[in-house]
Amino acid sequence: SAPDENDNIDQQVNILDEELARYPDVIAISSVDASACSVQFDLAIENGIPIVAFDSGNSYQNIQSTCKTNNIEAVTTGTKNFCEKIGDSGEILLLVHDTVSDTAKEREAEIKNELAANHPNVTVTETIYLDQLEMLKKQIVAEQVGVTPEELAAAEAGEKKEETTGTGDASETIADAASNAASSSADESANETAQEADNELSEKMQQVNDGAAKMSDEDAIQYYMEKHPDLKGCIATNETVTQLAIRTLDQFDSEKHITLVGFDAGKEQVNALKDGKVDGLIVQNPFGMGYATVVAAARTVLEIGNEAEVNTGYVWVTADNMNDDTITPFLYE
């Protein structure tokens, strides 16, 4: 069982609750959020149900075994090859699949560590997190219509308060928050009344919300590509953001080649690799990971012990080696 979306933490917790109610012999889980599910895990342990993690680990202390890619080794390999392709200098975008999962945190940290240690002339100009993309869309439109970051933050805080309390009119809440931001602005026109400022900013906030709702994920990523005309490339940290980067580059009208290195090798990534849209892929071993997880789960039930962490491997794939016999087993549709 899995959530409908990769980042749906609440749904994963609900699924875990349902599975625990069946009192399974063992739980194997790839955690959406590295710090989530501790209550469910405590319940599992209390009922003698061991836990095995795979793909993305969890900070919970009583997990029997974690079967996953060694992200430090994999990301170091990918980052070195990426830097070689861009001439070991220039501006890049980092596209990270979320802010909460173990894999996202590890991969982002190691990319930046490798760049700082061995590629000082390569600069990450923007780090974009997929689970923050909706807020980034609002920031983009806000900049275009003249809403300051402080005003946007105040309005967002007002909207969240309205959602929590369930009282009052949403437009009034935005206006109140906007009033607070506007009243603190040093350059507010002296002859403009507070009510006029409220109304004007409330109208702009409506434009922000409407504009953000119409903006696609690809449009948002393209905005940041266009914002940095000297951009040389992008590194994407999982399959979802790699596919997003591919679609963005398809619609991005640029005369120069933007180097793209991503993770995993589904059908879309493999086709993009063939077409030269992707320059390299860090590909995990999905079959090996699944096999290792089943073995680890069986060993916990049989009480014969496990390695705390099982490295399931990876390969570096390019258009030049993708048809090699050692590579094709890692590719999937």
Describe each PLM feature range:
Residues 1-333:
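A residue-level marker of the well-folded mature domains of exported/periplasmic proteins
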